[in-house]
Amino acid sequence: VLPLPQIIAALKIGAAIPQRALALTFDGGHISVYHEAWPRLKALGFAFTVFIATDFIDAGSQNYMSWDQLRELASSGVTIGTLGATYGHLVSLKEAKAAADIARANHRFMDEIGSIPELFAYPFGEYSANLQAIVARHGHSAAFGHHSGVIYRGADYLALPRFPLVGGYSNLARFRTVVDTLPLPVADLVPADPFLSNNPPALGFSIVGEMGPLDNLACYLARFGKLNLEQLGPSRIEVRFPEALPIGRNRVNCTLPGPGGRWRWFGLQLLVH
């Protein structure tokens, strides 16, 4: 278990990372992170990141950590990231309002923590090309969604995946699968903007590197199950949806058997409005 900024920095310069290295993240700043998660992880020497919506902290609710508690975490080596101020649907806001939300949060972090977080997490995992650009302009070097997958050096650092471990996915079997998973690197992803203008979208990507035969590549969407794939040439994959995607968040997961019984995984979220 490594600090998330350390993993990002190593990937960007091509430095070695241990096999099965992982980072732990929590969204929202709930008080249970302070009282339950932090003592256990500290005893194990495990680093983690907590993403904060500053309005929730400023409201003073007993359900969320206080600024004093966040300063205590930060001084102990916990990474503090940002969700913006309101934890609202930023992707649906006009550009100026989304930018103002992120900027207001950064001002609060400067006031209370003394620095602007390097890492951003999109509320509800929702992002668009425009929102990615806004996040970058406000000084955040990496941003995370809620789609599943393994990060790798050539990934889009403003659209990084995370494996959720909540609800029905919060069990040891799921955790073991996640830890064993390998990246499925892709390039030339279409559509470039996950905030869809056409529905159903023409989804396609190119597999990067030597992954062996792609006959066993499979992509899934919860609403439709296993999706039809068409391979164009040695590495280009086109995904065919049987009908328009429903309004809201649609997560596509693509897997390919890898070495040693492990799985390669690429995920993305498509947003219909």
Segments predicted by a language model, with ranges:
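Terminal accessory/targeting
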Residues: 1-21, 32-35, 39-48, 52-65, ...
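Metal-dependent polysaccharide deacetylase catalytic core of the NodB/CE4 family, i.e.
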Residues: 8-22, 30-131, 141, 154-164
